Amino acid sequence: MPQAHADKPLPMQKGEFVAGTWSADSGVTLDLLDPQGRHVRRLSDREKPAGVLMLVGPADGVYTVRAQGQGTYEWSVTERLPLAEQHAPAPTLDSPRLAALAQTLSQGGTTATFWEEMKRQGTPLIEPANATHDRVTFLWQGAERNVRLFGGPSTDHAQLSRLGDSDVWYVSFLVPKTARLSYRLAPDVPELPGTGMARRRAILATAQADPNNPKVYPERGIDAFQTYSVMELADAPPQPWVAPRAGVPAGSVEALELRSDILGNTRTIHLYRPAGWKPDGPDNHVLVLFDAGAYLGRVPTPTILDNMIAAGVIPPTAALLIDNPTADSRGRELPPNPDFADFLARELMPWARKQGIAVPAARTVIGGSSYGGLASSYAALRHPEVFGNVLSQSGSYWWSPPGEEDQWLTRQFVAVRTLPVRFFLGAGLFESGRGGQPGILETNRHLRDVLRAKGYLVTHREVAGGHDYLSWRGTLSDGLLELIGKNGLARQ
């Protein structure tokens, strides 16, 4: 066996990329030494007979590859790329209109005509892709450092790319023609030190409505920073109940305080009674909703109920909209909390009876979005004698108590007998998990499968939307139609 002991020079520049190959008997090691003869890194691997070299020059100088041991070896450099020649590939221009603009710019043209066109037709730029999908390109004009997308089809605050050195920033997505989404754009987001969460939240410093999109949500936002822009494609499902209708009598909304001995706090309950409400009506129904502020604002629940009742598609339905008493109480109360579920069943509903709002469980719907959807299903699990229908919008079924596997609530439904509860489970196609973890979309599908296997009546609805009140204001009426509508689950 020949003795391997040799030094060979390897000159490198700072930042230079060097690639090559090596092979060596198991008794041989190959090491890289710096210009002063100090060890930098091991190049060979005794568990493998051969491999690749991938190096970046730490500084200018002549480095050394040292071979030591018993056996044969060889190594060679196959590629070098100086730092000055290293450039990230240009982003792919999926948009035909942007590709045409890039061609114009390469010929010495400007972006002026392009921006005039975008302001005239409105953004985002929507181009047909195939029979079922459109290509949607979000645009921003004139940022200095970066632009990020807040909302939209991305769950990860997508970065916009700059078109050359122009004032056009863009990112494109292929989305179903049925999509409806809200979004904001954040130019020049601060690059903060610290944790990933702090850096992620920095987007809120500049996130604002798209200045070239006339469609906004809510329709009367306070300013650009409190307003979302709306992307609504041609085949987005209608939301026919969200706007006031001429000739439809409006119900009343009364705000009352309710003290809870179980929870030791006080909150506001907003009571909606439809026009002509009769406390002893034989077909009365009740809807219980969390996050009252959102469901009286972004989701116009009273208007939706007014319109649906007047059209005769649902029976007379009162609503209890529950406020969160403090800023941090939502995170304590809505994820499965026995005390909060008991408050709903043993304090809220008996109190509502005294207000002339009382129906059996089969005619009571409890619902909400995100944690509110999760809380609705848990309340029905713990108190099916009170809550016979669950209207869950993007329920957070990934949740689990600290130290336990995710999807805790789904396992609880596996463990108990089938209960007299019907379900409407809605989720958005753009609510998938990140980093290989199941998200809202996947965990709602899992709960659906478990409930159906247990014999529950379940309507499962997926829409081309995100974690978004713009979607939820539509699926609220969808869920009511399924659960208490004339042709819904209640009639099956």
Regions found by a protein language model. Name each.
Residues A90-D156, L163-Q492:
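Non-catalytic cap/lid and distal C-terminal segments of serine-dependent acyl enzymes
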Residues P2-A50, P58-D60, A67-Q70:
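Acidic, Ser/Thr/Pro-rich low-complexity intrinsically disordered segments
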Residues P11, M54-P58, S172-K177:
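Short, flexible loop/turn segments at beta-strand junctions in immunoglobulin-like
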Residues E47-V52, D165-W169:
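Aromatic sugar-binding surface patches on proteins
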Residues F17, G27-L30, T72-E74, R135, ...:
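Exposed beta-strand and adjacent loop surfaces of beta-rich binding modules
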Residues G69-R80:
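Edge beta-strands of jelly-roll/beta-sandwich modules across compartments, strongly enriched
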Residues A59-Y63, A179-L181:
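Exposed beta-strand face motif in extracellular beta-rich ectodomains
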Residues L32-D34, V77, L149-G151:
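Conserved aromatic beta-strand anchor motif in extracellular beta-sandwich/beta-rich domains
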